[in-house]
């Protein structure tokens, strides 16, 4: 979760009232923030936020804005925002190359003038930039931001897809490097180049004199892209891959600059070719948020309250949220700097915070029930105890993984596996149908530890339901364990299996397994009353090599659900 350090005097100046540290701690509570200490030497307050949905609070100006609104009823007005059908006068243009639509499509900006930046303001701006890009911007992948002295920039600015061989002097260096060299040599290139390095061309910002402004989202130009104490005219741009996230980040920063005392001058972004949007140009900062409907009955039902519409609207106003009624329906208008109202429930949460948690009295539950462990969980715990008693160490794994680990390395078919239709990353593309790949992956990184290794997991697996005409899935609880060492053989694991089922008081039958990941003749399927419930055996050298394992391994896996139902 985001942690920020803000100068206490700057913060209290914006709030407009002095508070002790303990009072500040109380002021932060409604906004899911915790007072984490005060450094007398630096004069900074340390604050930790327990929510990532409100990036507008991660600066001293944004936090002061919310506190003034909540406790003193001061809702700010930001009249520099454009709206649909009402674009403000623009003071510069950003021209977007149509090739950027497949790389990093969105860029928006504004100019800020009229205030001299001092050292503490600059430090606060840089910290906010970092927090915004790291947390809300997902380490610059989703959103990245740049700040520049606008006196060195000639508009219009071009946002182009450039050759990786294009050279300029990056910030913090005194020699020219190509974009490829920046990726490989510059600290920021090493940290962030993975975001764009798979593309044939890279994003570049050029002014009208063809000077490089920045290489987003990696690094600014050394000649133009550094903000200094004493600067008064600033250009701010935000690039990103998500339209609304990019716009919101720019809106939040614009409101912060305005609250500091700057004049905000809008900048127009011109898309030379539509990017699947319903416009070809946009004057920013731009208000894009949609109104959200709410129902008074739903508010009172979820909160267990009896609030009137008027009281609800007052509570929302304390959160900086305006509301109105039309045709017997009620709507909230999200503030310029917020986009966290996805559902009526989000509105109700703001009503609750606006009312104050102390105004809601605790009640005993009206329903009474006695809880207990399910039979499956009790049986699973017995199995865990047996495994620990036999010298195994319990592991806990993620249920999702890659095709490479679950299927390719195991040399098996993907017939039983569930695949995510739109995965964020290939590392979490499939839901596991077996625990064995997880155990082997652990073993592959454990060669430095003394042998033998004995690990197990009791966990969920999911299989396609192949026995019906309707698509579906079956979820089971499985036990799997792995033994590795120079002396580990089929006889060793067979002895452990026999001991396990002896203490479970279950009789099983064994038949030779045809699974590809076992050595021929050294794998067995486990049958209980003619039903196959699992298997065990020695892993083949081919599979071991796929995982980078160079020591013999034997594995076991059984379906606990079937074990219970058939025993």
Swiss-Prot record:
Catalyzed reaction equations: tRNA(Phe) + L-phenylalanine + ATP = L-phenylalanyl-tRNA(Phe) + AMP + diphosphate + H(+)
One Gene Ontology term from the biological process aspect of the record: phenylalanyl-tRNA aminoacylation
Record bears the keyword ATP-binding: yes
Compartments it resides in: Cytoplasm
Positions of Mg(2+) binding: 340, 346, 349-350
SMART domains found in the cross-reference section: B3_4, B5
Cofactor: Mg(2+)
Keywords per UniProt: Aminoacyl-tRNA synthetase, ATP-binding, Cytoplasm, Ligase, Magnesium, Metal-binding, Nucleotide-binding, Protein biosynthesis
Signal peptide from the UniProt entry: none
Positions of the B5 domain: 287-362
Keyword Aminoacyl-tRNA synthetase: yes
NCBIfam families recorded: pheT_arch (TIGR00471)
Quaternary structure and interacting proteins, as annotated: Tetramer of two alpha and two beta subunits.
Name recorded for this polypeptide: Phenylalanine--tRNA ligase beta subunit
Species name: Borreliella afzelii (strain PKo)
């Amino acid at each position: 979760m985001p942690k920020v350090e803000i100068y206490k005097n700057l913060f209290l100046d914006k709030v407009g009232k002095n508070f002790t540290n303990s009072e500040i701690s109380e002021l932060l509570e409604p906004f899911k923030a915790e007072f984490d200490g005060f450094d007398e030497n630096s004069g900074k307050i340390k604050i930790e936020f327990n929510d990532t949905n409100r990036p507008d609070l991660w600066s001293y100006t944004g936090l002061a804005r919310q506190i003034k609104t909540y406790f003193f009823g001061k809702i700010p007005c930001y009249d520099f925002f454009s709206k649909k059908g009402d674009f403000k006068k623009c003071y510069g243009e950003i021209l977007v190359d149509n090739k950027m639509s497949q790389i990093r499509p969105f860029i928006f900006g504004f100019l800020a003038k009229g205030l001299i930046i001092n050292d503490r303001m600059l430090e606060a701006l840089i910290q906010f930039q970092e927090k915004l890009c790291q947390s809300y911007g997902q380490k610059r992948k989703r959103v990245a931001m740049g700040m520049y002295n606008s006196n060195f920039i000639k508009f219009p600015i071009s946002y182009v897809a450039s050759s990786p061989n294009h050279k300029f002097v990056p910030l913090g260096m005194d020699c020219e490097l190509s974009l490829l060299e920046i990726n490989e040599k510059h600290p920021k290139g090493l940290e962030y180049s993975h975001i764009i390095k798979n593309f044939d061309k890279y994003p570049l910002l050029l002014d009208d004199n063809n000077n490089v402004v920045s290489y987003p989202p990696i690094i600014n130009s050394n000649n133009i892209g550094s903000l200094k104490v004493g600067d008064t005219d600033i250009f701010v741009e935000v690039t990103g891959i998500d339209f609304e996230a990019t716009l919101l980040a720019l809106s939040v920063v614009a409101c912060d600059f305005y609250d500091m005392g700057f004049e905000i001058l809008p900048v127009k972004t011109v898309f030379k070719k539509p990017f699947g949007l319903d416009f070809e140009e946009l004057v920013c900062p731009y208000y894009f948020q949609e109104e959200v409907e709410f129902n008074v009955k739903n508010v009172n039902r979820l909160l267990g309250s009896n609030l009137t519409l008027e009281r609800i609207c007052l509570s929302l106003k304390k959160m900086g949220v305006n509301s109105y009624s039309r045709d017997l329906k009620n709507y909230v208008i999200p503030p310029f700097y917020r986009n966290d109202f996805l559902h009526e429930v989000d509105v109700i949460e703001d009503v609750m915070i606006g009312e104050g948690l102390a105004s809601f009295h605790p009640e005993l539950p009206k329903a009474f029930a006695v809880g207990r462990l399910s039979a499956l969980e009790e049986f699973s715990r017995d199995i865990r105890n047996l495994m620990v008693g036999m010298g195994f160490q319990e592991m806990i794994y993620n249920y999702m993984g890659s095709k490479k680990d679950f299927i390719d390395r195991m040399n098996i078919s993907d017939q039983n596996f569930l695949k995510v239709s739109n995965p964020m990353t290939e590392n979490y593309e499939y839901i596991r149908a077996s625990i064995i790949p997880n155990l082997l992956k652990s073993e592959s990184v454990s060669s430095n530890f003394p042998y033998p290794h004995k690990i197990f997991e009791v966990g969920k697996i999911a299989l396609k339901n192949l026995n019906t005409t309707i698509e579906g899935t079956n979820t089971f609880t499985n036990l799997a364990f792995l033994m590795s060492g120079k002396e580990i053989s089929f006889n060793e694991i067979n002895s452990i299996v026999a001991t396990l089922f002896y203490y479970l008081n279950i009789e099983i039958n064994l038949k030779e397994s045809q699974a590809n990941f076992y050595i021929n003749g050294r794998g067995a399927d486990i049958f209980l009353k003619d039903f196959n419930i699992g298997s065990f055996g020695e892993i083949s050298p081919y599979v071991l090599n796929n995982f980078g394992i160079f020591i013999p391994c034997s594995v076991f896996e059984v379906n606990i659900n079937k074990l219970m139902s058939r025993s």
